[in-house]
């Protein structure tokens, strides 16, 4: 409860076994304030219980702000819609890492450094050959990114002076590894980066060019992918970002930390949701079957889930989904699919029906960022097993910004959550013949 005797509301009171503890209230620059419970365990001989950390702030951060009730997402104070419409991915990367938008000179230097570091060690090619041809690109990504620590042993004992170069290396090399993982999975030769192309063009070129076929990047496709990368760049302390921070708190090298983020992102409840949306739309098959599947989604005994709706944080329309809905239409119009893409037609009608249904309104289930992104990827010719890989490219920027911020935080400690133990109190060991 709030301390009514404190006019500035700087403390909360917690009563445990008859004893009152005053807990400092930490003021946020915007959004919810936070009660500091860090001394409760030492003074009250008990811990707090918060499964999934849904009510716990694990750190202080200046990078990303989310207001889920109002549908607000901001990076360093800038609205996500403004960044998606007016900026480009590397400018947003600079913003997340350094805290400010770059000047023209800073932007040019940054993009040149990213281009310079886009090549990977030639020996990495041998690692790809150890995977079978049916290997999931995310499995290859996970191994390849982790292996980078073998090629940069100087970063096993990194220093503060290494933070910025490490971030640039990671942002530069991840798209190259992503494209290599795709090429290997389809049996095509690797395509080297082309420093004459910008970041997004370069990735598309590495994905779709071949040694005997030149690939010309469609500007509408490039702009759409640029927006997708911006919209996925960071999202506060989600599962994968928290995983990167936890791994980083132990002093693990940055390549190992990003590998843990990739592993977490691979989960279908996190980075794999847009692929699940595509599978759901295919299962529905036609607009006439939407009411049937709406009913299945409402039936608690039916295993069917309406993918692409609802979010752990947003209780309003996901601002990223609003941008992607329009982007999806732009891409399909450019490709001549706007009026004849069955997945888009099902998605639009499904959204319209769900937003008018009291069941979804009461539960605040609105379309999220995954609802339209998969349709865009599919129209671009990107296979579903690559969807999460593209998420990795974008989110690496956020992971590195969060990793850098964590190491620069003077309050940084190794992460060590506690538990509520509910197992046996004590048991006597018996030999195997006595059991």
UniProtKB/Swiss-Prot annotation:
The keyword Magnesium does not apply. Keywords: Transferase, Tricarboxylic acid cycle. It is an enzyme of class 2 (transferase). It comes from the Bacteria. One of its GO terms (molecular function) is citrate (Si)-synthase activity. GO terms for biological process: tricarboxylic acid cycle. The active site is at 311, 370. Homohexamer. Belongs to the citrate synthase family. This is Citrate synthase. It comes from Rickettsia africae (strain ESF-5).
């Amino acid at each position: 409860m709030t301390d009514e005797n404190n006019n500035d509301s700087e403390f909360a009171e917690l009563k445990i076994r008859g004893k009152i503890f005053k807990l400092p209230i930490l003021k946020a620059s915007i959004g919810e304030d936070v009660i500091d419970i860090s001394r409760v365990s030492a003074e009250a001989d008990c811990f707090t219980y918060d499964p999934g950390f849904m009510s716990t702030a694990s750190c202080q951060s200046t990078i990303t702000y989310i207001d889920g009730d109002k549908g607000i997402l901001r990076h360093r104070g800038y609205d996500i819609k403004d960044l998606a419409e007016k900026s480009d991915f590397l400018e947003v990367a600079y913003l997340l890492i350094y805290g400010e938008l770059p000047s023209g000179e800073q932007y040019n230097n940054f993009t040149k450094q990213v281009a310079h570091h886009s090549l990977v060690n030639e020996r990495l090619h041998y690692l790809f050959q150890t995977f079978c041809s049916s290997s999931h690109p995310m499995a290859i990504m996970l191994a390849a990114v982790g292996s980078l620590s073998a090629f940069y042993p100087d970063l096993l004992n990194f220093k503060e002076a290494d933070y910025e170069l490490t971030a640039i290396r990671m942002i530069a090399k991840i798209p190259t590894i992503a494209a290599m993982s795709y090429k290997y999975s389809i049996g095509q030769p690797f395509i080297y980066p082309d420093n004459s192309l910008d970041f997004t063009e370069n990735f598309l070129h590495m994905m779709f060019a071949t040694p005997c076929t030149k690939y010309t990047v469609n500007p509408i496709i490039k702009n759409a992918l640029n927006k997708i990368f911006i919209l996925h760049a960071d999202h506060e302390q989600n599962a994968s970002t928290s995983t990167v921070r936890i791994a980083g708190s132990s002093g693990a090298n940055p390549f190992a930390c990003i590998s843990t983020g990739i592993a977490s992102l691979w989960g279908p409840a996190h980075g794999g949701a847009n692929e699940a949306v595509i599978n759901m739309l295919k299962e529905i098959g036609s607009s006439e079957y939407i009411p049937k599947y709406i009913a299945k989604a409402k039936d608690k005994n039916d295993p069917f889930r309406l993918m692409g709706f609802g979010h752990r944080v947003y209780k309003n329309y996901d601002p990223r989904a609003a941008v992607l809905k329009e982007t999806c239409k732009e891409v399909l119009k450019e490709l001549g699919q706007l009026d004849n893409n069955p997945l888009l037609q099902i998605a639009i009608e499904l959204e319209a029906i769900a937003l008018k249904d009291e069941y979804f309104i009461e539960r605040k289930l609105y379309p999220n960022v995954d609802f339209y992104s998969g349709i865009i990827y599919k129209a671009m010719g990107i296979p579903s097993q690559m969807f999460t890989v593209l998420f990795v490219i974008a989110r690496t920027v956020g992971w590195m910004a969060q990793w850098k911020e964590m190491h620069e935080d003077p309050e940084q400690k190794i992460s060590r959550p506690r538990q509520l133990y509910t197992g046996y109190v004590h048991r006597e060991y018996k030999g195997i013949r006595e059991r």
